[in-house]
């Protein structure tokens, strides 16, 4: 029997290190990599950029198709950003979870609120910078944004951080290796929940209890 995958949401202000943590988590040599994991691929109406492939970076669709999917209630969450739509397909996520794949959604706090309403069992994680000063230093260290853009990102970061207490877990990314260990621990913790183990270890407990099957507990 396939053990259903877990759904995780990771949210963070720009510069907190969320993308780096996700990439490190998914590396084959990570402690959590014994089980299949994948970052969700969003649907979007924006044009593909050079080097982006349909189905790999995004699912590129027309505005008409996206709005049709909205009318069908096909998204766990969606938003319009700078005139383009972005959304997370409910059917695609559920298909991956049913195959035993742990799925990670890289979305903001507003998207997290939408997903929680549809899937209360989702595990939500907020990645926080260690300080305003460090966050600004990281943003400036990229060398790609003007002072005006950095000021805007800092204001947006404050708005993002004001919702930290809506999440199940908070990781402060001060030391990257420690933050990665914290994230890995959360993922492994969810896999050890009784609901998961009663399926994964069904044969074991059937033998221990001398019964044909053990019904998963809520």
UniProtKB/Swiss-Prot annotation:
One of its GO terms (cellular component) is cytosol. It comes from Colwellia psychrerythraea (strain 34H / ATCC BAA-681) (Vibrio psychroerythus). GO terms for molecular function: ATP binding; guanylate kinase activity. ATP binds at residues 12-19. Its EC number is 2.7.4.8. InterPro entries: GK/Ca_channel_bsu, Guanylate_kin-like_dom, Guanylate_kinase, Guanylate_kinase_CS, P-loop_NTPase. Keywords: ATP-binding, Cytoplasm, Kinase, Nucleotide-binding, Transferase. NCBIfam families: guanyl_kin. HAMAP family: Guanylate_kinase. The gene is gmk. It catalyses: GMP + ATP = GDP + ADP. Essential for recycling GMP and indirectly, cGMP. This is Guanylate kinase. Belongs to the guanylate kinase family. Residues 5-188 form the Guanylate kinase-like domain. It is found in: Cytoplasm. Coiled coil: none annotated.
């Amino acid at each position: 029997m396939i053990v259903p995958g877990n759904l995780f949401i990771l949210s963070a202000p720009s510069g907190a290190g969320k993308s780096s943590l996700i990439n490190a988590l998914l590396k084959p040599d990570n402690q959590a990599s014994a089980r299949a994991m994948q970052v969700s691929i969003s649907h979007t109406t924006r044009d593909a950029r050079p080097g982006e492939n349909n189905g790999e970076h995004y699912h590129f669709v027309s505005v008409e198709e996206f709005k049709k999917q909205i009318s069908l209630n096909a998204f766990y969450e969606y938003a319009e950003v700078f005139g383009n739509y972005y959304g997370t397909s409910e059917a695609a996520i559920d298909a991956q979870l049913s195959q035993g794949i742990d799925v990670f959604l890289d979305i903001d706090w507003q998207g997290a609120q939408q997903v929680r309403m549809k899937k209360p069992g989702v595990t939500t994680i907020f990645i926080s910078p260690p300080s305003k000063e460090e966050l600004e230093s990281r943003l400036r260290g990229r060398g790609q944004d003007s002072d005006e853009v950095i000021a805007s990102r800092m204001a947006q970061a404050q708005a993002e951080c004001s919702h930290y207490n809506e999440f199940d877990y908070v990781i402060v990314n001060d030391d990257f290796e420690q933050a990665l260990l914290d994230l890995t621990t959360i993922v492994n913790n969810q896999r050890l929940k009784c609901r998961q183990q009663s399926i994964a270890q069904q044969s074991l407990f059937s033998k221990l209890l001398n019964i044909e099957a053990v019904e998963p507990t809520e």
